Each structure stands twice: as structure tokens, then as C-alpha cells.
Amino acid sequence: MSNLGKCTRCQKTVYSQEGFIAVKVPFHRSCFKCEVCNWQLVLTNYKSINGKVYCANHYPVGGLSVTPEKTHTTSDDLVMKNALNAPRVETVNEQLRGGNEKPQTSTDDLVTKNALNAPKSNLVNNQVRGTSDSAPLTSADDLVTRNALKAPKSDLVNNQVRGTSEMGPQAGIDIVTANALKAPKLETMSGYQKSVQN
């Protein structure tokens, strides 16, 4: 059994299995208590100032002072030793990332096979938009152009309505003109209309 030294509280010898070192001095587990209230402390909940240990409630909080207070955070504490011996970030990153090794990749996995067999983006675009070598669709083959060519021409429709088609004027009198010629003639005399018989 190794001897850690004399306990600060009881002045008895502290062996490694019955005590520990905190604030650079040995304590028995049962002697590690708050200086004010004698509350049992452990290494995770104590505070120290000037070599004495306190609980969180009785830790002296002072204002400005002429004498400097020595707070305790050294590398001798168990918590600090564990923190100093913890693996470094660089070591963890090298272990996880594999350092400077090349990645192990193959084309045997399913995702890579599907990606290799997928249609290429320019092929899909050519199917949808047409190839860049072909001219734009302005020929008479599209539906809009065909319908526009089949539509009746506006001057042809107007000529048929007005009777001025290329066949020449109509010879003969139509019914409207014949009825107008047969209608009784009216004379106007001082605002009155009189019927005149032929």
C-alpha cells in the first residue's frame, strides 16, 4: 500500500485505497468536508481557496482585497489529470478519418452501379428539347402552322360577302332589288307623305 501523506484534517496517514489528494494535500474520504458546515464533499462538488475546501454554498465570495487569494486549479487534481490525459482532437480525427490513406471505393456497390447506368443529363435534354444541331421547330409540320395554312383568308371571305369576287358582277336582279323597285313611291309635301300610284 502506498502512503499519500498525512491527512490535513485528522493528521493520520492516508493510504491510496482510503483517500486521495485534492488541493495538493491528502485527505481521507471521510475527512473531505466543507470547512464551514462539515458537509461531505467529493472531487466533483468541492471548491477551494487558500488550501481549504468548501461546498458551493459556503465558498467565500469576496470583493476587492489587498491580499491576493490563491484559487486552486492545478494539474495534480484527479479531474485535471483526466482532462490532460484525454485523447487530443488530432488523434481522434486521425483514428476516425484514417489519416492520409486513400479511400477504399469500388464499383461493386448498388448505388455506384445505378449511377453508372443512369441516363446522362445531356441525353435526356436532347430527347426533350431536341438536339442542338437541329433547327428550331418552324417548319409547316407543327400543328399551329398547319391550322393557320388551312384557315380561310380574310380577303376571300370579304370578297364573297361583298359580291366582288373574281367571277365578275352578277347579271340580273336579286329579290331585294326587285322588291325595292316595286315599292310605292312617296312624295313629301310640307312634312306629309303622300302615296303616288304609278
Swiss-Prot record:
Q: Which residues belong to any copy of the LIM zinc-binding domain?
A: 5-65
Give the transmembrane region(s). Answer: none
A Pfam family per the record: LIM
Q: Which keywords accompany this UniProt record? A: Actin-binding, Cell projection, Chemotaxis, Cytoplasm, Cytoskeleton, LIM domain, Metal-binding, Repeat, Zinc
Q: What is its main location?
A: other
An example Gene Ontology cellular component term from the record? macropinosome
| PROSITE patterns the record matches | LIM_DOMAIN_1, LIM_DOMAIN_2
- Subcellular localization, as worded in the UniProt entry: Cell projection, Pseudopodium; Cytoplasm, Cell cortex; Cytoplasm, Cytoskeleton
GO molecular-function terms, A-Z: actin filament binding; metal ion binding
Effect of a null allele: Cells exhibit normal growth, but display altered morphology and F-actin distribution. They show changes in chemotactic motility associated with increased pseudopod formation, are significantly impaired in growth under stress conditions and highly sensitive to osmotic shock.
The record's listing under PANTHER family reads: OS06G0237300 PROTEIN
According to its UniProt entry, what is the function of this protein? Binds to F-actin and may modulate the chemotactic response during early development and contribute to the maintenance of the strength of the actin cytoskeleton.
The name this protein goes by in its record: LIM domain-containing protein D
Coding gene?
limD
